[in-house]
UniProtKB/Swiss-Prot annotation:
Species the sequence originates in: Fusarium vanettenii (Neocosmospora pisi)
Key words of the record: Activator, DNA-binding, Metal-binding, Nucleus, Transcription, Transcription regulation, Zinc, Zinc-finger
Annotated protein name in UniProt: Cutinase gene palindrome-binding protein
Lineage, opening ranks: Eukaryota, Fungi, Dikarya, Ascomycota, Pezizomycotina
Signal peptide per UniProt: none
Chain positions covered by the region annotation Disordered: 256-330, 434-457
Length: 457
């Protein structure tokens, strides 16, 4: 039964197969009941060309309206489910792509939508074509940049590298990839990442018929600003990871140092306890018995105890505090304080802490090196002509602590019950008045009474 008969009778083949008995179908076990593959062209011819064209247009319309809410706002609309319908969906998408490529001047439309700017150079490096996206990236229009040598728009320090890479790519045919600083229309330089290749034409396209060797017809280059947003995020992520790893190692080192110092302090304390086992309490206390010893005396070393036995001056107190082992917080505080200079060294590559460029020490060369020691400056041997005169000794002023009020600032230090210069001016005067009054009262109490003249009586 042909397709034409099917259309004329208006019956489907399934209706005729339903009239057949199962026994009749069983007797045809060895006979193939499958349908052979039919040529698409013959099927199109049998059903008519207008119907096939209509079905193709409908499939393209369905593929284009797949994500259109207005077209999908009908019963049964929307994306096709998975299964056999998915293959039909892929077929329609492929047909849509084919329809796009069949459009007129579609490569130019693709180039217009590029965010990176495309440039075509001749063999001499002159710009023959630039994509419209160059206006957003560099500020130049296509007409302003056409027929200009690209090297004239590159930073002078990068021109040599660009010319060498361009000539090497033209000579060898290898693709080129380089970074250079491009001068924008506002006069500022921006870093660009460029990839490209030279188009080597055949000998039959040579302008000179006498020269039948292949030649470079054009150089295609694609440039974009560097770094991109994703590259910048990746660089910052790597910098944070490196900084985190460095801080972890530093913390581990400080913890090991603190544990070693604690062990050493414990050993010294044990040795001091063993050495003081044969000392009487009166000999061991001495002057320090006047001070209150807290319960944490075990953490003090011999240097701390010796510092407490000295006179209460600011220098001695600071020395006692400095002789104690630093805690982890103190070490981290010092480390955090020096991180600023370390950041400068990491960003600039200079030995900032040692004085390079920070204190005016520079040689002025392209690759300066830090000069240590004698820098070649003439220094006279005799700076002071009065070298024979005796130099006056600088009087080092010691700062005292008042044992009564605890002040450190006083215009004058006076004698107290603990010795000279142990009281401030006010406390010393007050104590002197008390002593004077006490002495006068004692003297008045022990003074002899008035003599009575018995002769007068």
């Amino acid at each position: 039964m042909t397709g034409g008969q099917m259309g004329a009778d208006g019956q489907d083949s399934t209706d005729i197969m339903a009239l057949l008995d199962n026994n009749m179908l069983g007797s045809m076990g060895d006979v193939s009941m499958g349908l052979d593959a039919v040529d698409e062209s013959s099927m199109t011819g049998s059903f008519g060309g207008s119907n096939a064209q209509t079905s193709t247009e409908e499939s393209v319309a369905r593929a284009e309206n797949q994500f259109n809410t207005a077209a999908n706002n009908v019963p049964g609309a929307g994306p096709l489910p998975a299964g056999p319908f998915a293959q039909m969906n892929l077929t329609s998408a492929a047909s849509t792509l084919t329809e796009f490529t069949k459009r007129r001047n579609w490569p130019a439309k693709v180039v217009e939508e590029l965010r990176d700017f495309l440039q075509i150079l001749d063999a001499n490096g002159r710009i023959k074509y630039a994509s419209p996206s160059i206006l957003n990236v560099t500020g130049y229009s296509v007409e302003e940049i056409q027929d200009i040598f690209l090297k004239d728009l590159i930073h002078p320090d990068d021109r040599g590298v660009f010319v060498a890479e361009l000539n090497e790519s033209i000579a060898s045919g290898n693709p080129l990839r380089l970074f250079y600083r491009f001068k924008k229309k506002d006069g500022k330089f921006a870093i660009f990442e460029t990839v490209g290749h030279a188009h080597i034409a055949g000998s039959k396209f040579a302008p000179n018929p006498n020269n039948q060797s292949p030649f470079c017809q054009a150089v295609f280059m694609m440039a974009r600003p560097y770094p991109t947003k994703n590259a910048g995020l990746l660089d910052s992520f790597l910098e944070h990871k490196i900084e985190n790893e460095r801080l972890k190692r530093r913390i581990a080192e400080l913890r090991r140092e603190e544990e070693a110092e604690n062990d050493e302090a414990q050993k010294q304390w044990m040795q001091s306890q063993e050495g003081r086992s044969d000392v009487t309490p009166s000999e061991g206390t001495g002057v320090s018995s006047n001070f209150f010893r807290p319960s944490t005396d075990r953490g003090l070393t011999d240097a701390d105890r010796a510092a407490l036995n000295k006179s209460l001056t600011r220098e001695n107190l600071e020395g006692a505090a400095g002789s104690r082992p630093d805690s982890l917080n103190d070490k981290m505080a010092r480390y955090e304080g020096a991180s600023h200079t370390e950041t400068i060294e990491m960003l600039t590559g200079l030995r900032y802490i040692e004085g390079e460029r920070s204190r005016g020490i520079t040689t002025g060369n392209a690759s300066p090196t830090l000069i240590k020691g004698d820098a070649g400056i003439a220094i006279p041997l005799e700076r002071d002509p009065r070298t024979g005169d005796k130099k006056k000794k600088l009087k080092t002023s010691e700062e005292y602590v008042c044992t009564d009020c605890g002040t450190l600032d006083s215009p004058e230090w006076r004698k107290g019950p603990s010795g000279p210069k142990t009281l401030c001016n006010a406390c010393g005067l007050r104590w002197a008045k008390k002593e004077k009054k006490r002495n006068s009262s004692v003297n008045h109490h022990h003074a002899p009474g008035p003599a009575i003249d018995h002769s007068m009586a």
